[in-house]
């Protein structure tokens, strides 16, 4: 695992990172709604097959949970951005700050592209279903990590309790 990461990081940091061979253009266009892990992965493979791919995402930067939910210590944003830049070099177009249904209609997307792939993520924290879970200062782990990633100010008070023991809870503790 460490060897794979070393080789991958070294390639991404080189002047000429590996870009897979791109098949001849198919003449088909694909819109991918959502620029998180699934959207980025799909765009990579669709572009490799010769399709004209556009990612449409509501956030200011692509990456979804990779950017806004996983802390820097687990996934350096510089590495993520280099991966996204590589996908752009493959010819994938990236349209950010665009909310489907608000800034751009789904109907317009369907009319413009031959295919549409929806890869919108699951950004919801599982709420505590108990008394007091709705008082000010109580927030879900995913919401907390997203606010930190966006450099939003959070008033944590003098003491904090993290409920849970999974990855999100541990990331919240370490953050």
Annotate each predicted stretch with a short phrase.
Residues 23-30, 138, 156-157:
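A short, charged/proline- and glycine-enriched loop
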Residues 51-67:
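Glycine-rich FAD pyrophosphate-binding loop
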Residues 31-56, 95-106, 110, 124-126, ...:
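Rossmann-like dinucleotide/flavin-binding elements
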Residues 116-118, 122-145:
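Glycine-rich beta-alpha-beta "Rossmann" dinucleotide-binding loop(s) and their flanking helix/strand
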Residues 52, 91-93, 137:
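Conserved beta-strand segments of alpha/beta enzyme cores
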Residues 22-25, 110-111, 131-132, 152-155:
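Solvent-exposed alpha-helices and their adjacent loops that cap or buttress functional pockets
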Residues 1-24, 148-149:
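Ferredoxin-type iron-sulfur electron-transfer modules in oxidoreductases and energy-metabolism complexes
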Residues 3, 66-114:
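N-terminal Rossmann-like dinucleotide/flavin-binding domain of flavoprotein oxidoreductases
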């Amino acid at each position: 695992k460490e060897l794979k990461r070393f080789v991958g990081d070294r390639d991404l940091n080189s002047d000429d990172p590996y870009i897979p061979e791109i098949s001849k253009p198919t003449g088909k266009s694909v819109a991918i709604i959502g620029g998180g892990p699934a959207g980025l992965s799909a765009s990579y493979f669709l572009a490799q097959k010769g399709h004209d791919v556009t990612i449409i995402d509501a956030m200011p930067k692509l990456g979804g949970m990779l950017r806004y939910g996983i802390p820097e210590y687990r996934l350096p944003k510089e590495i993520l951005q280099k991966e996204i830049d590589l996908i752009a070099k493959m010819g994938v177009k990236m349209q950010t700050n665009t909310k489907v249904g608000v800034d751009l209609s789904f109907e317009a997307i369907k009319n413009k592209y031959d295919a549409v792939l929806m890869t919108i993520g699951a950004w919801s924290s599982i709420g505590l279903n108990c008394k007091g879970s709705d008082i000010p200062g109580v927030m879900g782990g995913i919401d907390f990590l997203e606010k930190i990633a966006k450099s939003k100010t959070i008033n944590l008070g003098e003491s904090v309790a993290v409920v849970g023991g999974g990855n999100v809870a541990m990331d919240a503790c370490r953050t």
